[in-house]
Amino acid sequence: MKLYLVRHGKALSADQDLAQPLSVEGRDDITRLARTLGNMNVKVARILHSGKLRSEETARLVAAVLQPAGGVHKTGNLGPGDDISPVLELVRAEEENLMLVGHLPFLANLLQALVEAPDQDDLPLFDTGNLVAVEKIGSRWQVFRHLGPRMIM
């Protein structure tokens, strides 16, 4: 099973728009990431997002390319300050490839728990629009891919 963790793309500041939709740069970055994932033949059964507009827009841009059979869905457990425990349970029970689109510090905390890293300093960074992919091998999770807008030309 592969799990793709995606931090939402760059968004407008709350001063510009309280809903904080993706900025033009954020949309471009995520569109480029989605195309790269499509070119790599990445397959996910479904994409879950936090429900915040920037997260939903990111999820939908990626889904437009990857076409997950299970669609795109909001889940209440991917917010910036949410407890990772319910999502850890969900991920551990999942058998199909899954993508989660969320925020910091949630994604970094989830990644740290999955790979059992003692310190987040040893893990890939979650800049806006970045993806970190992990794969379950036996009973352990390992990072196998890290992509972001600055890494994709």
Stretches with model-predicted labels:
Residues 90:
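Active-site nucleotide-sugar/metal-binding loop of Leloir-type enzymes
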Residues 104-114:
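Extended, charge-rich low-complexity interaction segments
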Residues 2-85, 93, 107-108, 118-122, ...:
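Active-site-proximal alpha-helix that buttresses catalytic centers in soluble enzyme cores
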Residues 3, 96-102:
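Generic beta-sheet signal
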